[in-house]
Amino acid sequence: MLVNILSKKPRAASVRWLGATVLFTLLTSPAWAFSIDDVAKQAQDLAGKGFEAPKSNLPSQFREMKFADYQQIQFNHDKAYWSKLKTPFKLEFYHQGMYFDTPVKINEVTSTTVKQIKYSPDYFNFGSVKHDPDSVKNLGFAGFKVIYPINSADKNDEIMSLLGASYFRVVGKGQVYGISARGLAIDTALPSGEEFPRFREFWVERPKQGDKHLVIYALLDSPRATGAYRFVVYPGRDTTVDVESKVFLRDKVGKLGMAPLTSMYLFGPNQPSPTLNYRPALHDSNGLSIHAGNGEWIWRPLNNPKHLSVSTYQVENPKGFGLLQRGRNFKDYEDLDDRYDLRPSAWIEPRGDWGKGKVELVEIPTADETNDNIVAFWTPDVLPDAKTPLALNYRLHFTRDEDKLHSQDIAYVSQTMRSTGDVKQSNLIREPDGSVAFLVDFVGPVLKGLDGATPVAAQVSIGDNGEMVENNVRYNPVTKGWRLTLRLKVKDDKKPVEMRAALVNGDKTLSETWSYQLPANE
């Protein structure tokens, strides 16, 4: 009867009734979904309040422990989070200890709820670390790691680590940890001192069966800034991370470093070890690569300077930048333990227009490989006010296939070698002449397609503190590329020397720009 009565209603009335039914269904259906907007609301609210420093609840025994003791506290793999779900992703957690002395809140997000993942000492094997069980009952986690069978289907591997400040590390198939990324850098290399924002809370979406990606949200906090982040992790030969970020300023900052990367450079062919070492090179990265908005490619080999060094590259709407590990042969490093040949490069691919700004490279002196002494980031020319978020999106690539990042129509630098400058005498013996020599190998498909007799030359510029005494380019039949030999005399060794070079054939540019700084006091 109801159907008959409704069928006799005027058409307009029927449509109105149907619309009301649909609206009622929408209002009563489970339409809730967690998003970066939820985190951004918290970040904006935090930015409007005074900063509250995180409080440590860590017993002194754990705070004062040595690294060897901290390493003994291992997560029990059989207790991995989501181990009973039909998903290849698992979570494991870091215990607090040493300078990781502040808990972070970690939540699981499902289609209907947000639930905190509670700390329990049962997650961990404490090894020989003696402790009072009551003192660790409610500690909280220091961070977490993402587990995924990236190298073989029957073996779980750690592919991402989030531990300390806003640091995170990522690897792809066949890679080992090296370079780190961060959420935000503030006042890096300024006399006032650097401020290290920290991720204070995470939300991790429970993956569905068959999902090949993992979604992580993070809330960032520091004395002068807050932020909301969304990370989408895609494991693979090159693991990629899509990053969506919204940063709010609490107070004025001297320098805001977006998409920061942190790495290590101790020595290499362009700056050999001052002491005899069987390893030809020791570094997580050996150069900064920039793809500028105007299409120019720049390669800046890294240094371990004797004094803090900051290099700036003005770039509007960058197409990409990163700290790369060029050189993938084991013989380039000869290190069986630390496998620097397997450490990934990190490449930032901006999404959308970033506007006017600069890529900055910071090089810090270090005496050993335990200190990360290289930082690179993009900093905007104009900072937003406290009520306006600075929103930047980008994709992070962690790769060992550096040549695939590069434009195929432009040659790139495969290695930079430094040597004592010399001149061959009439008796064929080479004698030093007080100059410094650099040998730069350029390779790439564009060069392989050229005949060895092609008149390739180098456009070179040297700063006021250097005098060029040789600029020679010759074909390299081994690499099917060209080698630039550049010799210069330094006027004042207490000052650095800036150099730039690129290969050309007539009016055509063949290569990226090699941009190098010979450090002072060397």
From Swiss-Prot:
Gene Ontology CC entries for this record: outer membrane-bounded periplasmic space
Single GO biological process annotation from the record: beta-glucan biosynthetic process
Recorded superkingdom: Bacteria
Subcellular location: Periplasm
Leader sequence residues: 1-33
Major subcellular site: periplasm
Keyword flag Signal: yes
Pathway as given in its UniProt record: Glycan metabolism; osmoregulated periplasmic glucan (OPG) biosynthesis
GO MF: carbohydrate binding; catalytic activity
Keywords tagged on the record: Periplasm, Signal
Gene3D superfamilies membership: 2.70.98.10, Immunoglobulins
Cross-referenced PANTHER family: GLUCANS BIOSYNTHESIS PROTEIN (PTHR30504), GLUCANS BIOSYNTHESIS PROTEIN G (PTHR30504:SF4)
Function of the molecule: Involved in the biosynthesis of osmoregulated periplasmic glucans (OPGs).
Record-stated family: Belongs to the OpgD/OpgG family.
Designated name of the protein: Glucans biosynthesis protein G
Protein's organism: Serratia proteamaculans (strain 568)
The gene coding this protein: mdoG
